[in-house]
């Protein structure tokens, strides 16, 4: 299941009792999700609309980064989805936390929302990378052509993709 990162504290909108029902939990920022409270609504939804247009402050990037790092450290998710889509982060810091905690960073099947340099930062840090179709229709299930074109264009070794021709073992389940 894909949950929403919906607070600056790194909370996801999946109840603790429900987490055990899912084999894999993906988490990411989604523009249409509801925030947990008015402060997070302002910081997560209103501010990014302006920042996408006029630029992100260092403070905003760090706040967003901290939210992702807290989500990773919480142990409540296996994969961070479409990093930097709708909310700019410091990719190196997020990648380091992902590596340290065994959380995969997704290259998304609709769009890779990071620059080539940011994707290579993830590779250089050694964070686990997963490709995902992000299918919103049955015809797109398993279509990883978008992320794999980035992998091929950047010369990334396919063997570092945790779900390339093999089933990954996710950190949250491995810890059980």
Tell what function each PLM region has.
Residues 2-4, 123, 146-148:
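Active-site catalytic microenvironments in core metabolic enzymes, especially phosphate/sugar-handling
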Residues 102-111:
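His/Asp/Glu-enriched short active-site or ligand-binding loop at hydrolase and phosphoryl-transfer sites
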Residues 104, 128, 157:
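Residue-level detector of anion-binding/catalytic polar loops
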């Amino acid at each position: 299941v894909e949950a929403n990162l919906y607070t600056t504290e790194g909370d996801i909108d999946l109840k603790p009792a429900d987490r055990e029902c899912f084999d894999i939990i993906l988490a990411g920022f989604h523009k249409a999700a509801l925030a947990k409270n008015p402060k997070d609504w302002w910081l997560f939804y209103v501010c990014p609309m302006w920042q996408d247009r006029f630029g992100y402050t260092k403070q905003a990037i760090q706040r967003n980064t901290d939210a992702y790092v807290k989500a990773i450290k919480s142990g409540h998710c296996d994969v961070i989805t479409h990093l930097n889509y709708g909310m700019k982060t410091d990719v190196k810091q997020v990648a380091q936390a992902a590596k340290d905690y065994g959380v995969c960073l997704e290259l998304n099947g609709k769009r890779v929302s990071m620059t080539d340099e940011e994707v290579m930062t993830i590779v250089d840090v050694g964070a686990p990378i997963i490709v995902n179709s992000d299918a919103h229709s049955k015809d797109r299930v398993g279509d990883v052509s978008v992320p794999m074109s980035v992998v091929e264009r950047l010369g990334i070794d396919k063997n570092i993709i945790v779900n390339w021709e093999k089933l990954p073992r996710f950190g949250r389940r491995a810890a059980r």
